[in-house]
A protein has these predicted regions:
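Peripheral/terminal regions associated with large enzymatic or DNA-binding modules
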Residues: 1-62, 66-219
Length: 219
């Protein structure tokens, strides 16, 4: 099981002090960090990390603002094949009834935790970089996101729908992680949000209370 954490410098304190120790405590061994030190933006940094994947295995991609469930590593090892989405956000328009094995167009769009075959990651990066998004986009949203340098999740979802529409992917319920940007100072992308982007299916609420206490004690 390989894990890649997508991070920005502002969140490295959480990644190093809390997230990686939590993963290692569950037995995770191969953990990498892709730190966007140059602040290229989430799309450019994500595609660069995708292009750099090697081999024919797969990698679990985590954002730097997630809390893994108490049996995260065990469940990931059981699901360590193909494309797997481990997070569903109640406010991102994901189909809440589409869990288990679904065709790629019904994959959850949320990108906080997703397993991607390394060959698919490389293919996605090449596809995104090769498209002329102002003229060839399959949707009106993508050219805007391209100009803003955002929307890594949306581009990957579009990649699956366009290039691998008949692939069967896994939407995991209960979710494998909870999104806790609100606990870490808010979204580094938007800097505002009128709702909490929380997991729809999350069973380990006590872990959030414990983490909140540890972060408070750190200050």
């Amino acid at each position: 099981m390989k894990t890649l954490i997508h991070a920005v410098p502002e969140r490295m304190w959480y990644v190093e002090e809390f997230l990686i120790p939590a993963l290692r405590a569950q037995g995770a061994e191969k953990i990498e960090i892709w730190n966007d030190e140059a602040h290229e933006g989430n799309l450019a940094a994500c595609m660069a990390s995708f292009a750099a994947r090697e081999g024919d295995g797969g990698t679990w991609h985590l954002q730097d603002d997630v809390l893994p469930c108490r049996d995260f590593v065990k469940r990931c090892r059981e699901l360590d094949d193909g494309v797997v989405f481990g997070f569903c956000c109640r406010n991102f328009g994901d189909r809440l009834d589409a869990f288990g094995q679904v065709y790629a167009p019904d994959a959850w769009n949320s990108f906080q935790c997703v397993r991607i075959p390394d060959a698919y990651a490389r293919e996605c990066a090449a596809w995104v970089r090769s498209m002329r998004w102002d003229k060839e986009s399959p949707s009106a949203e993508l050219p805007i996101l391209w100009k803003l340098g955002k929307g890594d999740d949306t581009f990957f979802h579009e990649f699956l729908a366009c290039r691998h529409p008949y692939d069967v992917v896994e939407n995991v319920k209960p979710n494998l992680v909870e999104h806790i940007d609100w606990l870490l100072g808010g979204s580094t992308l938007l800097h505002w949000r009128d709702y909490l982007a929380r997991a729809e299916f999350w069973d380990d609420e006590d872990l959030i209370a414990a983490l909140r206490a540890r972060i408070k004690a750190r200050v």
